């Protein structure tokens, strides 16, 4: 979940967007398709536009400006860029079909995109193989954004997972659609009938939240969550990696994470990767929990060896994995911005951009491909003040205020290419990483798609 910045935090004119990490489809917007291990600046992208939100999906990226314009780039095989075609675009380009329809928020799933307009309407484009577009009788994919019917409710927050989506309305009702969680639920809850919202291909109300008012929602690979106006966190779906802070293998009904897990403080913001979560409380403390084997949690680990989730009734206790309960890495206290990729994270603390977690494609921005086990500053951005951060599954984006003196900018190389200068320079190295991504993803999801191409994007 990306926090809505206040008016005082609006991006100044002297700002620039930086991108790094996986780039097999041009999702960094740099005009080429080579992975980038250090942050690189997109020349003049933010001038004179001011950026409101940045985020990414499986192999694509999206930026929303203060004026409500949507810019997209990267993988477009299923039309997830909403440009009316299926050609990949390695540089940020405006989604012209949305001109005159200001966008408030955008959420990127693996191969689809959900948009929220300023008047509370939800749009979708991309793959619809699992009903993730919220249009039950629609085509297998949609290359232009189309409206989703949410029972005439005004929506205030959206989230996109691997193969499902979630929305919260102004009245605090939560809707879910897409069948991405259903196969996991059937496997872990044999003989049980799953609630409709797990199998619906159109928005279906999430039952079990009737006594709470959702302010925001989030979606992981096989789980969902909501944050209420009372500062409570509810979770449902798969608990394979302890991401639900519960002993059940699968939660078919939302359950609240008890307040003592957050030191009895109200939660004010929450974010989700594929299999881990990050939350911030009213005093600025940060809590992380869930999968930890790539450094996702940013804190010292208990042993992870030997833990295995067995098939069982969802209400029977399972062997709780290490780090399945929220715990606070003190170094993250006071973060003003946070974003989670599939297994890595970005945060801004005191104007400094920090990264940690999975780093196979260089998305932690330290110039290496070694996992980062504790939050550390992105050295290449130390001379700039971080304003916003956003993650795709395996790539990173940051909006930074540039120093007054250009000579102070570290690593000033700019590799942005105009459309006329684009060259497809994918190397064998990128192909090898795509193969590694596919092997790693098989651990995260037991259901595979033959046409998936793993590259390190969400």
Curated annotation (Swiss-Prot):
Subcellular locations according to the entry: Cytoplasm; Nucleus
Main location: cytoplasm
Annotated SUPFAM superfamilies: RCC1/BLIP-II (SSF50985)
Keyword Repeat: yes
GO cellular component, one term: nucleus
UniProt KW keywords: Cytoplasm, Guanine-nucleotide releasing factor, Nucleus, Phosphoprotein, Repeat
GO biological process: negative regulation of protein secretion; signal transduction
Name assigned to this protein: Secretion-regulating guanine nucleotide exchange factor
Species of the source: Homo sapiens (Human)
Lineage, broadest ranks: Eukaryota, Metazoa, Chordata, Craniata, Vertebrata
Gene expressing this chain: SERGEF
């Amino acid at each position: 979940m990306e926090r809505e910045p206040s008016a005082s935090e609006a991006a100044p004119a002297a700002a620039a967007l930086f991108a790094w990490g996986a780039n097999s489809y041009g999702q960094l917007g740099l005009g080429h398709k080579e992975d980038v291990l250090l942050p690189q600046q997109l020349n003049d992208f933010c001038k004179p536009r001011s950026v409101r939100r940045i985020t990414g999906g499986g192999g694509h990226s999206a930026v929303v400006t203060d004026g409500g314009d949507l810019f997209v780039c990267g993988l477009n095989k299923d039309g997830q860029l909403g440009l009316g075609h299926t050609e990949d675009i390695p540089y940020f380009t405006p989604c012209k079909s949305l001109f005159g329809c200001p966008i408030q928020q955008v959420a990127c799933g693996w191969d689809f995109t959900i948009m929220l307009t300023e008047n509370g309407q939800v749009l979708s484009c991309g793959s619809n193989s699992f009903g993730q577009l919220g249009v039950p009788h629609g085509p297998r994919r949609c290359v232009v954004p189309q409206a989703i019917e949410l029972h005439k409710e005004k929506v205030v927050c959206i989230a996109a997972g691997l193969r499902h989506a979630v929305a919260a309305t102004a009245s605090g009702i939560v809707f879910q659609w897409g069948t991405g969680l259903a196969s996991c639920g059937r496997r872990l809850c044999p003989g049980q009938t799953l609630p409709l919202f797990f199998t619906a291909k159109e928005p279906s109300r999430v039952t079990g939240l009737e006594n709470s008012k959702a302010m925001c929602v989030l979606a992981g690979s096989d789980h969902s969550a909501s944050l209420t106006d009372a500062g409570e966190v509810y979770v449902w779906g798969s608990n394979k990696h302890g991401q639900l802070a519960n002993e059940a293998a699968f939660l078919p009904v939302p359950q609240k994470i008890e307040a003592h897990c957050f030191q009895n403080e109200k939660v004010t913001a929450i974010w989700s990767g594929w299999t881990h979560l990050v939350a911030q409380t009213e005093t600025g403390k940060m809590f992380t929990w869930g999968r930890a084997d790539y450094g996702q949690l940013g804190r010292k680990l208990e042993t992870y060896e030997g833990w295995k989730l067995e098939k069982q009734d969802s209400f029977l206790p399972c062997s709780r994995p290490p780090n399945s309960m929220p715990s606070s890495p003190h170094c993250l206290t006071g973060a003003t911005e946070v974003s989670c990729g599939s297994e890595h994270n970005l945060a801004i603390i005191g104007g400094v951009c920090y990264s940690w977690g999975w780093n196979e494609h260089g998305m932690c921005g330290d110039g290496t491909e070694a996992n980062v086990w504790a939050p550390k500053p992105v050295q290449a951005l130390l001379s700039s003040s971080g304003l916003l951060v956003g993650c795709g599954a395996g790539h990173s984006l940051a909006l930074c205020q540039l120093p007054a003196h250009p000579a102070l900018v570290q690593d000033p190389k700019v590799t942005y290419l105009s459309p006329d200068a684009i060259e497809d320079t994918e190397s064998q190295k990128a192909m090898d990483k795509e193969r590694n991504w596919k092997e790693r993803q098989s651990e995260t999801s037991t259901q595979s798609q033959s046409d998936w191409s793993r590259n390190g994007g969400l």
